[in-house]
């Protein structure tokens, strides 16, 4: 008798420096979030994106092949540089279940938290907690599209 197993899931948490002209950053990143949410939904990826005005922090999770393809695409994107993997590996269950991309833009508080966590060198758990906090109801994230059916 075969048991139904949940599909394999991997996750990737990274940080990078923005190369977007500051005058255009808010609009550019809003459009990026909308486009990414749609693409992520089609690939079965979920996650969250934080933008401080100077850097990005993003957590993505989903099927390993889809996540690998997205990692390659993100690593080649000219809107940022210095992509640093903070955490990666298999997941037992999704942390951002119905968010193809939860997104929160620039704020002083957010920028301070992100920069402090990156500077420590061991800030991956703190950053993951921050991303998850934004993805809970009334946590501050904006939906960039309708939630996926799960």
Regions found by a protein language model. Name each.
Residues 1-150:
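Charge-rich, low-complexity N-terminal segments
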């Amino acid at each position: 008798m075969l048991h139904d197993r949940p599909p394999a899931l991997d996750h990737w948490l990274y940080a990078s420096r923005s190369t977007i002209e500051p005058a255009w950053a808010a609009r550019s990143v809003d459009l990026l979030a909308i486009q990414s949410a749609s693409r992520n939904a089609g690939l079965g990826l979920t996650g969250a994106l934080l933008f401080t005005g100077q850097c990005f922090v993003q957590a993505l999770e989903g099927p390993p092949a889809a996540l690998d393809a997205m990692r390659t695409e993100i690593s080649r994107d000219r809107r940022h540089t210095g992509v640093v993997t903070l955490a990666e590996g298999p997941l037992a269950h999704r942390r951002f279940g119905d968010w193809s991309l939860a997104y929160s833009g620039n704020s002083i508080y957010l920028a301070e938290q992100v920069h402090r966590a990156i500077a420590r060198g061991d800030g991956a758990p703190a950053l993951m907690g921050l991303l998850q906090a934004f993805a809970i109801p009334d946590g501050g994230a904006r939906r960039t599209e309708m939630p996926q059916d799960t």
